[in-house]
Amino acid sequence: VTQNQEVNITGLSLTIKPSRSSNLVWVQGFISHNCDSNQQAHFFVSRNGTNISPIGDAGGGNQKRAFVSAQGNQDYMGNWVVKNTPFWFMDTPATTSTVTYQVGAIMGVTNSQYLWINRSQRDTSGTGYDMRAVSNITAWEVSG
């Protein structure tokens, strides 16, 4: 993954069609992940291709919108730990058209970084600590 590039995470998306344009959409989920040592993984959610992560706007023209940041092996305690990062927020799509929510990642330190989803970096078979995991995104309409 190239530094500061927004990349969609395959399989972590959904569509919902609000019945009224005044209704809200509650979006929640979690990401199971591991990344290279001394690297940073930032996660975001987009609506119809636009990053709508609910934490702070970009400042100074160079920061990305992201809802969580994780340090590489400093945070993961090694290349065998799978971290689980939850997210949740209320969105106001203001439409009755189909809306697609997509989870993505931004790597933040150097180019050629690796981010593993639902597994560890090492991913060694037959050990008691290299687990496989799942990630999830769920949304439901809330009357507004």
Model-based region annotation:
Residues 1-18:
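Extracellular/luminal regions of secreted and cell-surface proteins that mediate adhesion/ECM remodeling
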Residues 17-24, 28-98, 102-144:
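Terminal beta-strand-rich extracellular "head" domains
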